[in-house]
Swiss-Prot record:
Protein name, entry field: Phosphatidate phosphatase LPIN1
UniProt-recorded Gene Ontology molecular function terms: histone deacetylase binding; peroxisome proliferator activated receptor binding; phosphatidate phosphatase activity; RNA polymerase II-specific DNA-binding transcription factor binding; transcription coactivator activity
Region (C-LIP): 658-864
Organism ancestry: Eukaryota, Metazoa, Chordata, Craniata, Vertebrata
Function: Acts as a magnesium-dependent phosphatidate phosphatase enzyme which catalyzes the conversion of phosphatidic acid to diacylglycerol during triglyceride, phosphatidylcholine and phosphatidylethanolamine biosynthesis and therefore controls the metabolism of fatty acids at different levels. Is involved in adipocyte differentiation. Also acts as nuclear transcriptional coactivator for PPARGC1A/PPARA regulatory pathway to modulate lipid metabolism gene expression.
Length: 924
């Protein structure tokens, strides 16, 4: 019985440890990276697929992933998305590059964020001190006003109670409309916990695990039930949070909650959150990525997360935009009780000085969620909305009465409820627009460049085709933009507006106006009746906000349609020099859009969105019933007139956009100082309570002319697919006999090994440990990159074990690896598998059929071109030099062509002369 008890205990402990390794909440992994040195010395790499589990980065200090290679830190960093994926941030200044929404992101912050926050704090304190004593006592921290701290505390408590009652009533009414809204619950420790900007860490919080100064970390509330844990890049991820009830809350409750959007660092300050939403948005576990709730009552669909090789995770698209449009027409939508408002930043610098903070308070920034539903509206609805909104300039619109603002903006903001969370750094009164104008110019220059594209506006609010990725509505919230979820309308919104007209004027000295273009616009029916219209010399093609002739526009449109990306800027300029007509020796427009102007349309039908020249319907973007349009001017004189007169104000514009990428450039790879062969790499994320979460992998530096052997794992190294996952973890040797010796001898002949399996990325550490564990009398498997599927655990297991279709992943992965070896078109010399699907995958990437081997559970090895020849790993090991000839000749006396010139062919005796007796007799 003692033996039985010990055996049961050992099995229990083993299964428990196995569950810890497979628990989706703690599942982290890294796929090995392959770097290929090209003939010209440049480097190319496979994608950096790194994923952190939920518990490992539950309360991350920043969403910054540090990288160590061979024990030394490198100057490159990755950023962490809300699905746990890590990615690099690539800066681009191509104003015509089309960046999908799920690839847009904000830059990785440096010390500039801390400097800006300190500047904003100083401005806020100075403003509070200038107020009357009662207001100052209410806004200052308790440490500054000890005598009036209790009074301000009681007032804040009454505010929260009133806000709680409103939110509870709204929650009962709209519970079916938005299940992610949660009411605020008050804590019994409200009177003992200071609810302002001066937060302190609790005594039981362990110290940080690194040497980073604590002032760079966001402070943590001492409130035991509603502590806030800000996430990275000063971006507070969307969480179930309270929204100010703009129709029921008195004006004084809405004051001081104006959120300020800082374009280049996405710094956000949000309203106070509920206890249930006090944590930041954390990476989704593998089970959550697959097992989405299907009983949603809202129009939004929580779709399965697709994570393909070489790409970032994005939601599957199942519903068409037209169905969304028909299901919820804008005109028949009932105005809900709770509203979110979006603060629109005008490019005109005088707007900030003309607005008073009182008129702008109460406007919550419109922050996107991880899965955003875009509302499509037709032009008739837009006309009706535009007619209802009185035409007025931007500054006058901001001074409009508050209820009117709520009414005009609610119709389009209500479908996409946003979740905001208030910053703990700015006290009780938030941040004002004056904080931006009073900021130190040196600090402001880090975030608000003076020139560039109008990126601070939503994409649909402008007619131009330029994309400023870091300034999209999803980017300002950080979490939404890094969540990896692509909106179902991205396929429409990412394409630039294209229109054609017979207005002419490209070769004249006059400029092409929008009215003139629309006057001669060509409809679809006209173009269908007369396709030869493209030969008309007066034809003008409008791509975004730029005008071309057909000869110039044709390659641009072809590249966008075929490759979903624009031509390089140098190529476009070369085409324009050859094909575009000249205007008085000067180009007809400035390529970089330096002469872009902002025109405020006063017509009601143009207050909301443009129409008539867009080929597809675009989602309506309303901002205080004001439509700010960007049109391209074509003269330097207009550009000079459009410059703001005052240079002291800040311009929220930038022509630099940021996008996610999983690959590094050749220069970045060279900066890693990799050595030939394997290089250990560690990806780490610092957390406030769990310390540092690490994810280990290997970077392999190979040459373009190396020969690679592909090997499957499940069923090829192990004896079966299913038991190969379980039995080795329990300590049972479930490996084919002789495979370690065979692979070792093949590697000694100069071949590289690549282990490719359709297992999930979360099983990387377990699989890598198994490959290191295989040992046959002192002989181990050769080192090689481990390539796994970046998809979730359960989807990978379902594809590998249940569907038995691993070729879906393998073909995509191996094709990408093969392309890295160019100009070597056949880098894969041989391959080992166990199923017909493996044979199909290997044939697709160019492996010769006579060097594809499959093994069955009995250990019988079959060569595909001669299936009757049944062998084994042990027998193949005996003739390894014939099947896998030696590549490294330094220790060999054989000639390169061993079948023609070798020791045997040189020393063998010549054949005796042979005479054909029949021929001799016939001749006689």
């Amino acid at each position: 019985m003692n033996y039985v008890g010990q055996l049961a205990g050992q099995v229990f402990v083993t299964v428990k440890e196995l569950y810890k390794g497979l628990n989706p909440a703690t599942l982290s992994g890294c796929i090995d990276i392959i770097v290929i040195r090209q003939p010209n010395g440049s480097l190319q790499c496979s994608p950096f697929h790194v994923r952190f589990g939920k518990m490992g980065v539950l309360r991350s200090r920043e969403k910054v992933v540090d990288i160590e290679i061979n024990g030394e830190s490198v100057d490159l960093h990755m950023k962490l998305g809300d699905n746990g994926e890590a990615f690099f941030v690539q800066e681009t200044d191509n104003d015509q590059e089309i960046i999908p929404m799920y690839l847009a992101t904000s830059p990785i912050l440096s010390e500039g964020a801390a400097r800006m926050e300190s500047q904003l704090k100083r401005n806020s304190v100075d403003r509070i001190r200038c107020l009357d004593p009662t207001t100052a006592a209410q806004g200052l921290p308790p440490s500054d006003t000890p005598s009036t701290g209790s009074l301000g505390k009681k007032r804040r408590k009454r505010r929260r109670k009133a806000q709680l009652d409103n939110l509870k009533r709204d929650d009962n009414v709209n519970s079916s409309e938005d299940e992610d809204m949660f009411p605020i619950e008050m804590s019994s420790d409200e009177d003992t916990a200071p609810m302002d900007g001066s937060r302190t860490l609790p005594n039981d919080v362990p110290p940080f695990q690194d040497d980073i100064p604590k002032e760079n970390f966001p402070s943590i509330s001492t409130h035991p039930q509603s502590a806030s844990y800000p996430s990275s890049d000063r971006e507070w991820s969307p969480s179930p949070s309270s929204l100010v009830d703009c129709q029921r809350t008195p004006p004084h409750l809405a004051e001081g909650v104006l959120s300020s959007s800082c374009p280049l660092q996405s710094c956000h300050f949000h309203a106070s959150e509920s206890p249930s939403g006090s944590r930041p948005s954390t990476p989704k576990s593998d089970s959550e990525l697959v097992s989405k709730s299907a009983d949603r009552l809202t129009p939004k669909n929580n779709l399965e997360m697709l994570w393909l090789w070489g790409e970032l995770p994005q939601a599957a698209k199942s519903s068409s935009p037209h169905k969304m449009k028909e299901s919820s027409p804008l005109g028949s939508r009932k105005t809900p009780d709770k509203m979110n408002f979006q603060a629109i930043h005008s490019e005109s610098s005088d707007t900030f000085s003309d607005q008073s903070p009182t008129m702008a308070r109460g406007l919550l920034i419109h922050q996107s969620k991880a899965q955003t539903e875009m509302q499509f509206v037709n032009e008739e609805d837009l006309e009706s909305l535009g007619a209802a909104a009185p035409p007025s300039p931007v500054a006058e619109e901001l001074k409009a009465p508050y209820p009117n603002t709520a009414q005009s903006s609610s119709k389009t903001d209500s479908p996409s409820r946003k979740k905001d969370k208030r910053s703990r750094h700015l006290g009780a009164d938030g941040v004002y627009l004056d904080d931006l104008t009073d900021m130190d110019p040196e600090v402001a220059a880090l975030y608000f460049p003076k020139n560039g594209d109008p990126g601070g506006l939503p994409k649909q609010a402008s007619d131009n085709g330029a994309r400023s990725a870091n300034q999209s509505p999803q980017s300002v919230g950080g979490s939404g933009i890094d969540s990896g979820v692509e909106s179902t309308s991205d396929s429409l919104r990412d394409l630039p507006s294209i229109a054609i007209s017979l207005c002419g004027g490209l070769s004249d000295h006059r400029e092409i106006t929008k009215d003139a273009f629309l006057e001669q616009a060509v409809s679809y029916q006209q173009f269908a009746d007369n396709p030869a219209i493209i030969d008309d010399p007066n034809l003008v093609v409008k791509v975004g906000n730029k005008y071309y002739n057909w000869t110039t526009a044709a390659p641009l449109l072809l590249a966008m349609q075929a490759f979903q990306k624009p031509l390089p800027k140098a190529t476009v300029e070369s085409i324009m020099r050859d094909k575009m007509p000249k205007k008085g020796g000067r180009w007809w427009f400035s390529w970089r859009g330096r002469n872009a102007t902002i025109k405020e349309e006063s017509k009601p039908e143009q207050c909301l969105t443009g129409k008539g020249h867009n080929t597809g319907e675009q989602p309506a973007q309303l901002g205080l019933a004001t439509r700010i349009k960007h049109e391209s001017s074509s003269s330097d004189e207009e550009h000079a007139a459009a410059k703001p007169s005052g240079s002291s104000h800040l311009s929220l514009l930038s022509n630099v956009s940021y996008k996610k990428t999983l690959r590094l450039t050749s220069e970045q790879l060279k900066s890693l100082k990799l050595k030939n062969g394997p290089n250990d790499v560690v990806f780490s994320v610092t957390t406030q309570y769990q310390g540092t979460c690490r994810c280990e992998g290997t970077i392999y530096l190979w040459n373009w002319d190396d020969k690679v052997i592909i090997s499957d794992i499940d069923g090829t190294i192990t004896r079966s697919d299913t038991l190969g996952h379980i039995l080795p973890t329990l300590g049972k040797d479930w490996t084919h006999q002789g495979i370690a010796k065979l692979y070792h001898k093949v590697s000694q002949n100069g071949y590289k090994f690549l282990y490719c399996s359709a297992r999930a990325i979360g099983m990387a550490d377990m699989t890598r440990g198994y490959l290191h564990w295989v040992n046959e009398r002192g002989t181990v498997l050769p080192q090689g990159p481990l390539l796994l599927s970046p998809s979730s655990l359960f989807s990978a297991l379902h594809r590998e074990v249940i569907e038995k279709k691993p070729e879906k992943f393998k073909v995509q992965c191996l094709t990408d690896i093969k392309n890295l070896f160019f100009p070597n078109t056949e880098p894969f010399y041989a391959a080992f598998g166990n199923r017909p699907a493996d044979v199909y995958s290997y044939k697709q990437v160019g492996v010769s059929l006579n060097r594809i081997f499959t093994v069955n559970p009995k250990g019988e090895l079959v060569q595909e071109h001669a299936k009757t020849n049944i062998s084994s790993y042990v027998r193949l090991c005996e003739v390894v030099d014939h099947v896998f000839p030696l590549l490294k000749r330094s220790h060999s006396c054989d000639f390169p062509c061993s079948d023609t010139f070798s020791n045997f062919t040189f020393w063998r005796e010549p054949l005796p002369p042979f005479e054909n007796q029949d021929m001799h007799s016939a001749s006689a």
